[in-house]
Amino acid sequence: MSYQIAVLAGDGIGPEVMAEARKVLKAVEARFGLNIEYTEYDVGGIAIDNHGCPLPEATLKGCEAADAILFGSVGGPKWEKLPPNEQPERGALLPLRGHFELFCNLRPAKLHDGLEHMSPLRSDISARGFDVLCVRELTGGIYFGKPKGRQGEGESEEAFDTMRYSRREISRIARIAFEAARGRRKKVTSVDKANVLACSVLWRQVVEEVAVDFPDVELEHIYIDNATMQLLRRPDEFDVMLCSNLFGDILSDEIAMLTGSMGLLSSASMNSTGFGLFEPAGGSAPDIAGKGIANPIAQILSAALMLRHSLKQEEAASAIERAVTKALNSGYLTGELLSSDQRHKAKTTVQMGDFIADAVKAGV
């Protein structure tokens, strides 16, 4: 079977790490007999420079014709003074999410063996490790609710946002969380503020209704303020965390930083058909672009998420993840994962990609 992938490398380190993800995918194709065709499109700052807008029509049409989008990163100082809606991040990513109704965001975060020193957690806590999947509703809630705006003048001026969720929006994201938990440790922690917010009362009610269809999965509820604390005390006790848009925005970044490096974290944004946009959780890192030192693992793991969720190639996705684990366990690390006195051992972006691709070929 042939798959069509829209490749949007973007700005900063995007093209460098995307090249390594493509290298690893080539190894996957050879090992598993897959036929994946890639078409590159401009997005973000480079699209502004070449086409006058961050999301050209040709890019959007190319994404519409694809089975999935493999996204790099966008943005940088060069475009920061543009009007907000014309900047790379807001002018490209948000329209893509809206156009394809990418309502589900998956953010896995794992503390790998041997990298406990990277975590800001106390050593006795980090020694236990953790493996958490944050499932975030991405297109509803307070970020998109109407009315929204400002009114009045002087001391009477006020600003307002509306938090709004429908039963359908809650149910569909909850089902994804429970399905994900079935393939993991069979536990869902639903994050809300049901002691204060009407939206959260409905959220909790609908999640409990969905849970009836998943009797093999444990469900617990936790308030958002308590969740932020418990992630610092006992992250190893969480499996899948189900969150609304606002709460997921907060918690996914907290979970990410508990690993100690954004360079290891991937992200998937998907719609109800399984079509998705897969990207690193970090940014374009313009300060290190072109130096050959960027960590490509987040981009490579994004490719694994793409294989798993949009292309339904679980075996191939797992092969990439095992290869990444082998690299990390072998001490094959880029500079940001090493202490200052060990940075002379740092591997380059290309060396990391080579090692992981070779590990995939070897069938680790």
From Swiss-Prot:
Known catalytic reactions: (2R,3S)-3-isopropylmalate + NAD(+) = 4-methyl-2-oxopentanoate + CO2 + NADH
Give the PROSITE patterns listed for this entry: IDH_IMDH (PS00470)
Report the domain of life of the source organism: Bacteria
> How are cofactors bound according to the entry's free-text note?
Binds 1 Mg(2+) or Mn(2+) ion per subunit.
Give an example GO cellular component term for this record: cytosol
The entry lists its GO molecular-function terms as: 3-isopropylmalate dehydrogenase activity; magnesium ion binding; NAD binding
Q: Where along the chain is substrate bound?
A: 97, 107, 136, 225
In short, the EC number is 1.1.1.85
Q: Which SMART domains match?
A: Iso_dh (SM01329)
Alphabetically sorted, this entry's keywords are: Amino-acid biosynthesis, Branched-chain amino acid biosynthesis, Cytoplasm, Leucine biosynthesis, Magnesium, Manganese, Metal-binding, NAD, Oxidoreductase
Residues the record annotates as the site (Important for catalysis) are 143, 193
Q: Which residues bind NAD(+)?
A: 76-89, 283-295
Task: Give the residues the record marks as binding Mg(2+).
Answer: 225, 249, 253
Q: Where in the cell is it found?
A: Cytoplasm
Query: What are its GO biological-process terms?
Result: L-leucine biosynthetic process
Give, as in the UniProt entry, the pathway in which the protein acts.
Amino-acid biosynthesis; L-leucine biosynthesis; L-leucine from 3-methyl-2-oxobutanoate: step 3/4
Cofactor(s) needed for function: Mg(2+); Mn(2+)
Q: What does this protein do?
A: Catalyzes the oxidation of 3-carboxy-2-hydroxy-4-methylpentanoate (3-isopropylmalate) to 3-carboxy-4-methyl-2-oxopentanoate. The product decarboxylates to 4-methyl-2 oxopentanoate.
What PANTHER family does the record point to? 3-ISOPROPYLMALATE DEHYDROGENASE (PTHR42979:SF1)
Against NCBIfam families, the record matches this protein to: leuB
Known partners and oligomeric status:
Homodimer.
The entry sums up its family as follows: Belongs to the isocitrate and isopropylmalate dehydrogenases family. LeuB type 1 subfamily.
Q: What is this protein called?
A: 3-isopropylmalate dehydrogenase
Question: What is the protein's species of origin?
Answer: Shewanella oneidensis (strain ATCC 700550 / JCM 31522 / CIP 106686 / LMG 19005 / NCIMB 14063 / MR-1)
Identify the coding gene: leuB
